[in-house]
Regions:
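Short, low-complexity disordered leader/linker segments with a strong preference
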Residues: 1-70, 300, 304-305
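Exported/periplasmic ABC-transporter solute-binding proteins
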Residues: 45-91, 95-96, 109, 116, ...
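A short beta-strand-loop structural module common to alpha/beta enzyme folds
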Residues: 98-108
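A common structural microfeature
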Residues: 120-121, 155
Length: 305
């Protein structure tokens, strides 16, 4: 009997021995749960910190303005050297690296005809004042936001790739053209190209145009770009070209003679914003800004206010 009671007491003194594995398992589960929670918490903190760092980096990064609508420009041929540089300057100054600006270069008269026929240009940059004025009168009469503006003044030079011109003046240039009756001279079409119109006016003022025409010594180019090509390639002896073209190729002093501005009709170049595209107006404003005028002066034009 005592033995039975002793055994009974012994069994009662270890009642937890049978459930301790479960408690151990529960403890392990609790520990695992705490670990998982800690892991999630650390992950969330890391993610939040990473997000904050990314946001801070984004906020501190240079902001790029989104490009606006594409701009389509109809530009006089004499601008083919300077306008691409101005466009790059505009995009950089306005922080618009992805802005699309499409340019068509041709004679001002040809571009004028295209515009009046419905060509989809936003800006017209002529080599004279008359074409934009005609455009305003014919297509936008009474619209105050379609007023032509002067963006630069061109200069006329005589250029030769084969004949020395250093040290000439108006008198000696006239004598040169008269003395050598075999030389060929190119000018842009005076009916379409303002630089050609001014070249013809200069030759007329020197009593040369009629005689040169009669001798078939004047080779007429479609525009000022083609006139320069003829002279630069040596296809003709002399070319009346835009001084900006001479500047662009870094011609030597003996290759060109800058005609005095007062010796021919001033080549004031006007432009006009044709559409309501906001970026087109902004670009037109840039042309007249000190930054835009600096490009023109560097390229051989006369600055305008």
């Amino acid at each position: 009997m005592k033995a039975d009671q002793s055994n009974s007491r012994h069994k009662q003194t270890n009642p937890l021995s049978n459930v301790s594995p479960y408690l151990k398992a529960s403890k392990s589960i609790v520990t695992l749960g705490v670990s998982v929670c800690l892991a999630f918490a650390l992950s969330a903190c890391t993610k939040e910190a990473s997000t904050d760092e990314t946001q801070a980096a984004t906020n501190n990064a240079p902001q790029t303005t989104q490009p606006a609508e594409n701009i389509r420009i109809a530009a006089a041929a004499n601008l083919s050297d300077v306008l691409p540089e101005i466009i790059e300057g505009y995009k950089a100054d306005r922080n618009l690296p992805n802005q699309e600006i499409e340019v068509t270069f041709a004679s001002s008269g040809k571009l004028y005809s295209q515009i009046t026929s419905g060509a989809p240009y936003d800006v017209f940059l002529s080599a004279n004042q008359s074409y934009p004025a005609q455009l305003a009168e014919e297509m936008f009469k009474g619209e105050t936001n379609r007023t032509p503006f002067t963006y630069t003044q061109g200069q006329l030079s005589v250029y030769s790739a084969t004949k020395p011109l250093k040290g000439l003046n108006q008198t000696t240039l006239t004598d040169l053209f008269k003395s050598d009756d075999k030389t060929k001279i190119t000018i842009a079409n005076p009916e379409l190209a303002p630089y050609g119109e001014s070249a013809r006016a200069y030759l007329q003022s020197q009593d040369l145009y009629d005689s040169l025409t009669a001798q078939k010594r004047i080779i007429q180019a479609e525009n000022i770009g083609q006139a320069f090509q003829y002279a630069h390639a040596g296809s003709v002896d002399y070319g009346f070209v835009a001084h900006s073209q001479v500047t662009a190729i870094k011609a030597t002093p003996e290759q060109f003679y800058i005609l005095p501005p007062e010796s021919y009709p001033a080549i004031l170049q006007d432009g006009m914003v044709i559409t309501d595209v906001a970026t087109a107006k902004d670009f037109a404003d840039y042309l007249r800004s000190p930054e835009g005028q600096a490009y023109f002066s560097k390229a051989g034009y006369l600055a305008v206010k």
